[in-house]
Amino acid sequence: NQMKGGNKMQDLTLILEGGALRSLYTSGVLDVLMKYNIEANYVLGVSAGALTGMNYISKQKERSAKINIENCDNPRYIGMKALKKEGGIIGYDYLFDDLSKNAYPFDYETFKLSKQKFIPVITNCEKGITEYVEKNDCKEDIFKVVQASSSMPLCSKMVKIGNNHYLDGAVTMPIPVDWAIKEGHKKILVLLTKDRDYRKPEISNTMKKVY
């Protein structure tokens, strides 16, 4: 299921919304783009969109969907066992180590060498701002940035990167269209996982007290 040859970089920016397992829809769209060798030059991933976007950059069709479908009842991947062992409802160590090296090998080489700009979106908890980290400019482990982007408040522990702590990019910027426009991007394709009439609610008092 590896995408082979014939790719032409498109003047296209993809914005991938999060949404936990709703990202299966995003996976399907990205698989179709890969099938027809449509290679966007910019890919912004928020939360689960960042996890899904990694497989678009590594050119691995169906990998994202298989991991989520085949492991949705795997307690090491998601659930109380992951929470107890890793401090979060998603077992990121298990995902990036065991699963990505054995059951579902991740093509690190293709990912690393890709000329596409892959930008996970994260929330800086100290400063309360959104940060955009491009993989080739990242001074830290890009997989840690992806983990931070998809670490949901209350369900995950904060991820330390440098001197700051980070959480899900969707906390401050769920759909970074304005950022893309300000950066001069002209052709933007946004993959949404929520209903069209959805509106983000105000931050709860519980969330304010915790963070």
Residue ranges and their predicted role:
Residues 2-46, 54-211:
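Patatin-like phospholipase
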